[in-house]
């Protein structure tokens, strides 16, 4: 399944994996998974975290290594983001709930994810998504970015 991923996707997932793998030991524990999910505004229970890990933990050792993570991501991409998941993600970014993602809101979420971006990088991300040129990202623009293949 993971063999259907492009090199670019694998590189992106490697970066994401590193964000989860706080201690850099090459595996993701339930604790690390919980930390990242909470930084994204989710509040999973210990049992839910364990379920998520068990779903992809092929060798049954209780943690996720990179190949297992790739399998999980490939599976998720196959179920391509449902409308509801995209809406949920938009709400995480749109802190003040005004229907737009501003540069400040984007910076805030990326910082919570451990991504220290320069103002230029944040502005560049907004510009890439901002189809109507109003300096922020509305829901339609967000959907375009999230569903772009």
Swiss-Prot record:
Question: Which residues are reported to carry the modification N-acetylalanine?
Answer: 2
Residue positions where N6,N6,N6-trimethyllysine is found in the record: 116
Matches recorded under CDD domains: EFh
What residues bind Ca(2+) 3, as annotated?
Answer: 94, 96, 98, 100, 105
Q: Which UniProt keywords apply?
A: Acetylation, Calcium, Metal-binding, Methylation, Repeat
- Sites binding Ca(2+) 4 sit at 130, 132, 134, 136, 141
Q: Cellular component GO terms, alphabetically?
A: myosin II complex
Annotated transmembrane regions:
none
Misc note: This protein has four functional calcium-binding sites.
The task this protein performs is described as: Calmodulin acts as part of a calcium signal transduction pathway by mediating the control of a large number of enzymes, ion channels, aquaporins and other proteins through calcium-binding. Calcium-binding is required for the activation of calmodulin. Among the enzymes to be stimulated by the calmodulin-calcium complex are a number of protein kinases, such as myosin light-chain kinases and calmodulin-dependent protein kinase type II (CaMK2), and phosphatases.
Entry protein name? Calmodulin
Q: From which source organism is this entry?
A: Epinephelus akaara
């Amino acid at each position: 399944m993971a063999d259907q991923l492009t090199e670019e996707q694998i590189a992106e997932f490697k970066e994401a994996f590193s964000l989860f793998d706080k201690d850099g030991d090459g595996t993701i524990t339930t604790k690390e998974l919980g930390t990242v999910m909470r930084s994204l505004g989710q509040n999973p229970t210990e049992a839910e975290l364990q379920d998520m890990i068990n779903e992809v933990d092929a060798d049954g050792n209780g943690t996720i290594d990179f190949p297992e993570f790739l399998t999980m991501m490939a599976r998720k991409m196959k179920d391509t983001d449902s409308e509801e998941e995209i809406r949920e993600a938009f709400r995480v970014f749109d802190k003040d709930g005004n229907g737009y993602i501003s540069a400040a809101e984007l910076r805030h979420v990326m910082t919570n994810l451990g991504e220290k971006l320069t103002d230029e990088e944040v502005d560049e991300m907004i510009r890439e998504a901002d189809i109507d040129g109003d300096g922020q990202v509305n829901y339609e623009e967000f959907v375009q970015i999230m569903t772009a293949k």
